[in-house]
């Protein structure tokens, strides 16, 4: 891996963070097994803070030491560079932050698995969150990318989020986050720690039926038998990225250990031993061919994290 970053004025910034922050702190931690697609190099330092106080200490430390901070949720929708990630990679553990219920509002920790949010909702007799049943990753990551399906998205149910910075933490209304298709605007350096969902009382049995139908549809149309980060490109207005990638003859096309799925052409599957460079080669090829044939510039939905070579990113920029 590339040499670990060094913080200004500190011979070993990692030792300083280890000293200040309570929780799990791992040097040169492999990230591939912590992502859905099982690709990527190590983090200089991977931190899972023990509690909100430990997170506050971490955020102050990275600011004072000028160390980059990358937030990694459940590893879905993420491609980590083969060279890894410099600085600190932050993961919030499940159960991080106090949970609460007030009528139709649930407050849950950002580390909660997205696909299991319905369990908390149904236990409270609430519905309206059926779309999350098949979404991998964590609640915080789902909010950050406004994750969703054809039956709903996070902006439909999020009413407020708690943001932590080096200066403190507090709830902000969802309206201030500028939710849009597969994105939202988070303040620089802010970490989502808790999320307030506003749902509605309803028929839990009917909600379960809707979720099961959605799961069944995903199993039929998505490559869930191999590691994948989910949709690679966002759908352009009035069309579907998978249709376009298939139309230019790339469905099932392979580079190294990665392939465009022969089940759904907007999904890249790891056949075993894939590298980030393999995945990026597939993405560049698809974007180039679609642009040449249809005049459409596909936009990446997957989040690129870490130290990528400039040549690997050529052809992926707008």
From Swiss-Prot:
Cofactor(s) essential for the protein: FAD
Enzyme class: oxidoreductase
Gene Ontology CC annotation, any one: cytosol
Pathway info: Cell wall biogenesis; peptidoglycan biosynthesis
Catalytic activity reported: UDP-N-acetyl-alpha-D-muramate + NADP(+) = UDP-N-acetyl-3-O-(1-carboxyvinyl)-alpha-D-glucosamine + NADPH + H(+)
EC number: 1.3.1.98
Residues annotated as the enzyme's active site: 182, 231, 301
Top-level taxon in the UniProt lineage: Bacteria
Compartment annotation: Cytoplasm
Gene3D superfamilies given in the database record: 3.30.465.10, UDP-N-acetylenolpyruvoylglucosamine reductase, C-terminal domain (3.90.78.10), Uridine Diphospho-n-acetylenolpyruvylglucosamine Reductase, domain 2 (3.30.43.10)
Keyword set, alphabetical order: Cell cycle, Cell division, Cell shape, Cell wall biogenesis/degradation, Cytoplasm, FAD, Flavoprotein, NADP, Oxidoreductase, Peptidoglycan synthesis
FAD-binding PCMH-type domain segment(s): 39-202
Molecular function via GO: FAD binding; UDP-N-acetylmuramate dehydrogenase activity
Renumbered residue ranges of the record's region Disordered: 214-235
Keyword Protein biosynthesis: no
Main location: cytoplasm
Comp. bias (Basic and acidic residues): 214-223
Leader peptide range in chain numbering: none
GO biological process: cell division; cell wall organization; peptidoglycan biosynthetic process; regulation of cell shape
Function, in words: Cell wall formation.
HAMAP family given in the database record: MurB
Protein known as: UDP-N-acetylenolpyruvoylglucosamine reductase
Organism: Anaeromyxobacter sp. (strain Fw109-5)
Gene for this chain: murB
